Amino acid sequence: MTIDRHLKHLAQKDPENRQKALLDVLIQEGLEFSLQEQEPSIQNPRGIRNYLLTPWSPEPSLLFCAHYDAVPGTFGANDNAAAVCILIQLAQTLKKEHIPARFAFFDGEEAGNMGSKFYVSSLDRTSLTG
């Protein structure tokens, strides 16, 4: 799939459809991932679902991230499906070239960076070089 086709697929008004579209794209592109989930809360009634690509190298690496949620009621093409598409392409390229990297796609950015805060709370910083 190309970036423009990914973008059309990811630009969804409904948050559940957007999340499913991201899942579809990661599977179609053969990128292994894990799901980091946080239960729903008063601040974020949907809970958090971060998608973390499985590192292809045990070496310390750079971390690339983007949020996949969008302002409620919008398609989120600029904010932030475009960045997600670019990072998926970058992940494929770096993996093919055996360049160590980590990728995270965060939920809950529009609700106060909830997904990235949740991710950082359990991050092993020794696995990163920057």
Predicted regions and their residues:
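Histidine-centered divalent metal-coordination motifs
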Residues: 67
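Acidic/histidine-rich catalytic neighborhood of metal-dependent amide-processing enzymes
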Residues: 71-130
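A non-catalytic alpha/beta surface segment that caps or lines the substrate-entry region
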Residues: 2-56
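Active-site beta-strand-loop-beta-strand hairpin of nuclease catalytic cores
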Residues: 58-63
